[in-house]
Amino acid sequence: MLTLPFDESVVMPESQMCRKFSRECEDQKQIKKPESFSKQIVLRGKSIKRAPGEETEKEEEEEDREEEDENGLPRRRGLRKKKTTKLRLERVKFRRQEANARERNRMHGLNDALDNLRKVVPCYSKTQKLSKIETLRLAKNYIWALSEILRIGKRPDLLTFVQNLCKGLSQPTTNLVAGCLQLNARSFLMGQGGEAAHHTRSPYSTFYPPYHSPELTTPPGHGTLDNSKSMKPYNYCSAYESFYESTSPECASPQFEGPLSPPPINYNGIFSLKQEETLDYGKNYNYGMHYCAVPPRGPLGQGAMFRLPTDSHFPYDLHLRSQSLTMQDELNAVFHN
């Protein structure tokens, strides 16, 4: 029996043919791939309609992406800084001009509306112009005040109306509103929470209540003092009058009837009213100025004298002294009769 050695060329001749055919097919596919890809791009470009501005931008992006490196390798895809061309610069400049024109027209319309609002709001001045925020705040307060009038159905007090009108406004704007309504700005002082403190003698405000001191009344058991010579409660506004030699614009100071007018007081600070000590004080006068309301144990005689501890009776370190001999004589005559 003859035996033949195993030979691949003889036994498997078809395998080599299959290998050659498969290699040829792969080469043909590699050649056909770029052609089909280019055809697809052309077909898509024909089927899709693009705007002229978008076409230029997308074409530039595709060109940038399709560019190759120096080594022939494709570059990485992604956003990169675009090349500055004349068309692109003109396009950017035109867009910027349109945006500026829109903003300018918007600001002109806003300023015109604010000017019309300033004419309606109760605040007019030829020299001073309200700011935008102050105009809006005043308009809001004005609308709210008018709505309150309609809700209540009654005519409000002028001072209350102005206080509601000036809530949250600055001091210059408050002065303008008060001047427009012919009202003194000192008559209302706006607080932090919108509350006002009244310090005026106008018909729209309330007066200060007088300071009643029980120590200044007539001592019990001494009813010989005439009612015409009795002293009224002391008001601290007299310190303002004695210092400035004029009547205080903020409050009314009561006066003592008859010869018992309050002696002048020296003003040495905002919260302290002290007398000026002199070397001759006590030498020219036999009797002191300070009297108390405590009744003595014995009968009231000519030699009796009352001394008043002023620190316990008058707050803010207030002391009174006489500056004229006639005033001292009249006071002594009243208290020793």
Curated annotation (Swiss-Prot):
CDD domains xref list: bHLH_TS_NeuroD6_ATOH2
Renumbered to this chain, motif Nuclear localization signal spans 80-86
- Which keywords fit this entry according to its UniProt record? Activator, Developmental protein, Differentiation, DNA-binding, Neurogenesis, Nucleus, Transcription, Transcription regulation
- By its UniProt entry, which InterPro entries does this protein fall under? bHLH_dom, bHLH_transcription_factors, HLH_DNA-bd_sf, NeuroD_DUF, TF_bHLH_NeuroD
Q: Is the keyword Nucleus assigned to this protein?
A: yes
- Which residue spans traverse the membrane? none
Q: Where is the bHLH domain?
A: 94-146
One GO biological-process annotation of the entry reads: dentate gyrus development
- Compositionally biased residues, Acidic residues: 54-71
Q: Which GO terms describe its cellular component?
A: chromatin; nucleus
- State the Gene Ontology terms under molecular function: DNA-binding transcription activator activity, RNA polymerase II-specific; DNA-binding transcription factor activity, RNA polymerase II-specific; E-box binding; protein dimerization activity
In which compartments does the protein localize? Nucleus
List every stretch annotated Disordered: 43-82
List the PANTHER family hit by this protein, alphabetically. Answer: BASIC HELIX-LOOP-HELIX PROTEIN NEUROGENIN-RELATED, NEUROGENIC DIFFERENTIATION FACTOR 6
Q: How does it assemble?
A: Efficient DNA binding requires dimerization with another bHLH protein.
Reported function? Activates E box-dependent transcription in collaboration with TCF3/E47. May be a trans-acting factor involved in the development and maintenance of the mammalian nervous system. Transactivates the promoter of its own gene.
Q: What name does the UniProt record give this protein?
A: Neurogenic differentiation factor 6
Q: Which organism is it from?
A: Homo sapiens (Human)
